[in-house]
From Swiss-Prot:
The gene is RBCS4. This is Ribulose bisphosphate carboxylase small subunit, chloroplastic 4. InterPro entries: RuBisCO_ssu, RuBisCO_ssu_dom, RuBisCO_ssu_N, RuBisCO_ssu_sf. The lineage of its organism: Eukaryota, Viridiplantae, Streptophyta, Embryophyta, Tracheophyta. One of its GO terms (molecular function) is ribulose-bisphosphate carboxylase activity. The basic functional RuBisCO is composed of a large chain homodimer in a 'head-to-tail' conformation. In form I RuBisCO this homodimer is arranged in a barrel-like tetramer with the small subunits forming a tetrameric 'cap' on each end of the 'barrel'. SUPFAM superfamilies: RuBisCO, small subunit. RuBisCO catalyzes two reactions: the carboxylation of D-ribulose 1,5-bisphosphate, the primary event in carbon dioxide fixation, as well as the oxidative fragmentation of the pentose substrate. Both reactions occur simultaneously and in competition at the same active site. Although the small subunit is not catalytic it is essential for maximal activity. Involved in antiviral defenses. Belongs to the RuBisCO small chain family. It is found in: Plastid, Chloroplast; Cell junction, Plasmodesma. Gene3D superfamilies: Ribulose bisphosphate carboxylase, small subunit. GO terms for biological process: defense response to virus; photorespiration; reductive pentose-phosphate cycle.
Amino acid sequence: MASSIVSSAAVATRGNGAQASMVAPFTGLKSTASFPVSRKQNLDITSIASNGGRVSCMQVWPPINMKKYETLSYLPDLSDEQLLSEIEYLLKNGWVPCLEFETEHGFVYRENHKSPGYYDGRYWTMWKLPMFGCTDATQVLAEVQEAKKAYPQAWVRIIGFDNVRQVQCISFIAYKPEGY
């Protein structure tokens, strides 16, 4: 009989040790059911997401002979003062200006394949080298004028590169040939 008492005591001791190391569940968060909730009964069907009455003033961009090229292409041609303002913004952000030109297609086109690829008009010819260290917007504008003079039937765009992140940050058309 003594052996059975010792045996049950050993089991009880072992059971108490395991229970002492257990962690109680966290009960610090309260249920949201105890908080009062006020809900607005919205039975008005006109409050469903819509564009309201603005449907009549939306227009579709006419795709025939009015292609979009780059950023700001929906605006009229930029004047020299407006170009200087954009170039100053580019320089103020610490981006490196670079000029590119395209003599045949100033827009994305696909002649080699139906799906997008490397040769679909996104890559233009670089005008000289990127203007590293340029701090004067008039220097960039002078290069635009020189590119226009050399290639009067070409599109000229200004690009701003961030040489720290190594990405293109801005790109806009500075000159379009007559008729575009």
